Protein backbone atom coordinates (compact mmCIF):
# COMPACT_ATOMS: atom_id res chain seq x y z
CA UNK A 1 0.00 0.00 0.00
CA UNK A 2 1.27 3.46 -0.92
CA UNK A 3 1.08 5.91 1.95
CA UNK A 4 0.83 9.66 1.42
CA UNK A 5 3.41 11.85 3.14
CA UNK A 6 2.87 15.59 3.59
CA UNK A 7 5.75 17.89 4.60
CA UNK A 8 4.90 21.24 6.19
CA UNK A 9 7.70 23.70 6.96
CA UNK A 10 7.69 27.22 8.32
CA UNK A 11 9.19 29.58 10.90
CA UNK A 12 8.28 29.76 14.59
CA UNK A 13 4.70 30.87 15.21
CA UNK A 14 3.51 30.39 11.62
CA UNK A 15 0.69 28.13 12.76
CA UNK A 16 2.23 24.85 11.63
CA UNK A 17 1.23 22.78 14.63
CA UNK A 18 -2.35 24.03 14.94
CA UNK A 19 -3.05 23.79 11.22
CA UNK A 20 -1.40 20.45 10.52
CA UNK A 21 -3.17 18.88 13.49
CA UNK A 22 -6.52 19.98 12.06
CA UNK A 23 -5.66 18.72 8.58
CA UNK A 24 -4.56 15.36 9.99
CA UNK A 25 -7.77 15.05 12.00
CA UNK A 26 -9.99 15.83 9.02
CA UNK A 27 -8.17 13.36 6.75
CA UNK A 28 -7.48 10.64 9.32
CA UNK A 29 -3.70 11.03 8.94
CA UNK A 30 -1.13 10.71 11.72
CA UNK A 31 0.16 14.15 12.68
CA UNK A 32 3.91 13.97 13.32
CA UNK A 33 5.09 16.94 15.39
CA UNK A 34 8.86 16.96 14.86
CA UNK A 35 9.19 20.14 16.88
CA UNK A 36 7.93 18.23 19.90
CA UNK A 37 10.75 15.74 19.41
CA UNK A 38 13.39 18.47 19.44
CA UNK A 39 11.67 20.07 22.41
CA UNK A 40 11.72 16.74 24.25
CA UNK A 41 15.45 16.34 23.68
CA UNK A 42 15.98 19.95 24.81
CA UNK A 43 13.80 19.40 27.88
CA UNK A 44 15.99 16.46 28.84
CA UNK A 45 19.19 18.45 28.36
CA UNK A 46 17.90 21.35 30.47
CA UNK A 47 16.85 18.96 33.23
CA UNK A 48 20.44 17.74 33.24
CA UNK A 49 21.83 21.30 33.39
CA UNK A 50 23.07 21.29 29.81
CA UNK A 51 22.45 24.80 28.47
CA UNK A 52 25.26 25.15 25.95
CA UNK A 53 25.91 23.39 22.67
CA UNK A 54 28.72 21.04 23.65
CA UNK A 55 28.67 18.25 21.08
CA UNK A 56 30.67 15.88 23.25
CA UNK A 57 28.19 16.23 26.12
CA UNK A 58 25.25 16.02 23.72
CA UNK A 59 26.49 12.71 22.31
CA UNK A 60 27.03 11.39 25.83
CA UNK A 61 23.47 12.26 26.90
CA UNK A 62 21.97 10.80 23.72
CA UNK A 63 23.86 7.53 24.15
CA UNK A 64 21.95 6.79 27.36
CA UNK A 65 18.62 8.29 26.31
CA UNK A 66 15.59 6.11 25.70
CA UNK A 67 13.45 8.01 23.19
CA UNK A 68 10.11 6.88 21.82
CA UNK A 69 7.20 8.30 19.83
CA UNK A 70 3.79 6.65 20.06
CA UNK A 71 0.41 7.27 18.50
CA UNK A 72 -2.74 6.51 20.47
CA UNK A 73 -6.02 7.31 18.70
CA UNK A 74 -4.01 9.40 16.19
CA UNK A 75 -2.49 11.53 18.98
CA UNK A 76 1.29 11.74 19.28
CA UNK A 77 3.04 11.13 22.58
CA UNK A 78 6.77 11.70 23.12
CA UNK A 79 8.44 9.64 25.81
CA UNK A 80 11.84 10.26 27.39
CA UNK A 81 13.15 7.34 29.43
CA UNK A 82 9.61 6.01 29.63
CA UNK A 83 8.07 9.30 30.80
CA UNK A 84 5.45 11.08 28.68
CA UNK A 85 6.79 14.64 28.38
CA UNK A 86 4.36 15.83 25.70
CA UNK A 87 2.92 18.61 27.88
CA UNK A 88 6.03 19.47 29.90
CA UNK A 89 7.96 20.60 26.82
CA UNK A 90 5.68 23.57 26.05
CA UNK A 91 7.48 26.22 28.10
CA UNK A 92 9.24 29.47 27.26
CA UNK A 93 12.59 28.11 28.45
CA UNK A 94 12.36 25.01 26.27
CA UNK A 95 11.34 27.19 23.30
CA UNK A 96 14.38 29.40 23.86
CA UNK A 97 16.90 26.54 23.82
CA UNK A 98 15.32 24.25 21.19
CA UNK A 99 16.77 26.12 18.21
CA UNK A 100 20.22 25.96 19.83
CA UNK A 101 20.20 22.18 20.21
CA UNK A 102 18.62 21.71 16.78
CA UNK A 103 22.02 22.82 15.41
CA UNK A 104 23.64 19.70 16.83
CA UNK A 105 24.49 17.11 14.13
CA UNK A 106 24.12 14.37 16.74
CA UNK A 107 20.62 15.49 17.74
CA UNK A 108 19.50 15.77 14.13
CA UNK A 109 20.85 12.35 13.19
CA UNK A 110 19.27 10.88 16.32
CA UNK A 111 15.81 12.17 15.36
CA UNK A 112 15.70 12.04 11.56
CA UNK A 113 15.72 8.24 11.37
CA UNK A 114 12.79 8.14 13.78
CA UNK A 115 10.90 10.69 11.70
CA UNK A 116 11.49 8.87 8.41
CA UNK A 117 10.39 5.55 9.86
CA UNK A 118 7.10 7.08 11.01
CA UNK A 119 6.35 8.01 7.38
CA UNK A 120 6.70 4.41 6.20
CA UNK A 121 3.79 2.91 8.10
CA UNK A 122 0.86 5.32 7.66
CA UNK A 123 -0.48 8.38 5.90
CA UNK A 124 1.27 11.20 7.74
CA UNK A 125 1.49 14.96 7.82
CA UNK A 126 4.75 16.15 9.38
CA UNK A 127 5.69 19.68 10.34
CA UNK A 128 9.00 21.27 11.23
CA UNK A 129 11.67 23.46 9.65
CA UNK A 130 13.46 21.13 7.25
CA UNK A 131 10.92 18.42 6.51
CA UNK A 132 10.65 18.98 2.75
CA UNK A 133 14.36 19.65 2.24
CA UNK A 134 15.96 17.05 4.52
CA UNK A 135 13.68 14.67 6.41
CA UNK A 136 11.21 13.83 3.63
CA UNK A 137 12.73 15.20 0.41
CA UNK A 138 10.45 12.88 -1.60
CA UNK A 139 7.25 13.84 0.23
CA UNK A 140 4.12 13.67 -1.92
CA UNK A 141 3.02 17.17 -0.87
CA UNK A 142 5.32 19.99 0.28
CA UNK A 143 3.97 23.16 1.92
CA UNK A 144 5.59 26.23 3.48
CA UNK A 145 3.53 28.23 6.00
CA UNK A 146 4.54 31.73 7.00
CA UNK A 147 3.16 34.93 8.59
CA UNK A 148 4.47 38.33 9.64
CA UNK A 149 6.72 38.51 12.70
CA UNK A 150 4.10 40.62 14.48
CA UNK A 151 1.34 38.09 13.87
CA UNK A 152 3.52 35.17 14.89
CA UNK A 153 4.47 36.93 18.14
CA UNK A 154 0.80 37.63 18.86
CA UNK A 155 -0.07 33.97 18.35
CA UNK A 156 2.79 32.82 20.57
CA UNK A 157 1.66 35.11 23.41
CA UNK A 158 -1.87 33.73 23.09
CA UNK A 159 -0.50 30.18 23.25
CA UNK A 160 1.29 30.97 26.51
CA UNK A 161 -1.83 32.61 27.94
CA UNK A 162 -3.89 29.51 27.13
CA UNK A 163 -1.36 27.55 29.19
CA UNK A 164 -1.90 29.93 32.10
CA UNK A 165 1.39 31.77 31.52
CA UNK A 166 0.38 35.44 31.68
CA UNK A 167 3.66 37.24 32.43
CA UNK A 168 4.85 37.08 28.81
CA UNK A 169 6.03 40.30 27.16
CA UNK A 170 4.92 40.72 23.53
CA UNK A 171 7.97 42.75 22.46
CA UNK A 172 10.33 40.24 24.04
CA UNK A 173 8.55 37.37 22.26
CA UNK A 174 8.78 39.27 18.96
CA UNK A 175 12.52 39.79 19.37
CA UNK A 176 12.99 36.11 20.26
CA UNK A 177 11.10 35.10 17.10
CA UNK A 178 13.29 37.40 14.99
CA UNK A 179 16.39 35.87 16.54
CA UNK A 180 15.07 32.37 15.97
CA UNK A 181 14.26 33.18 12.34
CA UNK A 182 17.85 34.31 11.83
CA UNK A 183 19.22 31.17 13.47
CA UNK A 184 16.94 28.87 11.47
CA UNK A 185 17.68 30.57 8.15
CA UNK A 186 21.44 30.78 8.64
CA UNK A 187 22.40 27.58 10.43
CA UNK A 188 25.01 25.46 8.67
CA UNK A 189 22.99 22.27 8.92
CA UNK A 190 19.60 22.13 7.14
CA UNK A 191 18.65 25.82 7.18
CA UNK A 192 14.98 26.77 6.84
CA UNK A 193 14.16 26.77 3.11
CA UNK A 194 10.99 28.14 1.53
CA UNK A 195 9.44 25.69 -0.95
CA UNK A 196 7.25 26.70 -3.88
CA UNK A 197 3.89 25.88 -2.26
CA UNK A 198 4.01 28.80 0.21
CA UNK A 199 0.94 30.01 2.09
CA UNK A 200 1.04 33.34 3.98
CA UNK A 201 -1.34 32.87 6.92
CA UNK A 202 -1.17 36.45 8.27
CA UNK A 203 -4.56 37.50 6.89
CA UNK A 204 -6.15 34.05 6.67
CA UNK A 205 -8.28 32.24 9.21
CA UNK A 206 -7.14 28.84 10.41
CA UNK A 207 -10.04 27.19 8.58
CA UNK A 208 -9.07 28.87 5.30
CA UNK A 209 -5.50 27.59 5.55
CA UNK A 210 -6.68 24.10 6.47
CA UNK A 211 -8.94 23.96 3.41
CA UNK A 212 -6.13 25.11 1.11
CA UNK A 213 -3.88 22.32 2.35
CA UNK A 214 -6.61 19.69 2.14
CA UNK A 215 -7.22 20.67 -1.50
CA UNK A 216 -3.54 20.06 -2.29
CA UNK A 217 -3.54 16.68 -0.54
CA UNK A 218 -6.81 15.54 -2.12
CA UNK A 219 -5.41 16.38 -5.54
CA UNK A 220 -2.39 14.17 -4.84
CA UNK A 221 -4.54 11.34 -3.48
CA UNK A 222 -6.56 11.30 -6.69
CA UNK A 223 -3.59 11.06 -9.04
Put a short name on every predicted segment.
Residues 11-14:
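ATP-binding Walker
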Residues 86-98, 102-162:
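ATP-dependent NMP and nucleoside kinases share a basic, alpha-helical "lid"
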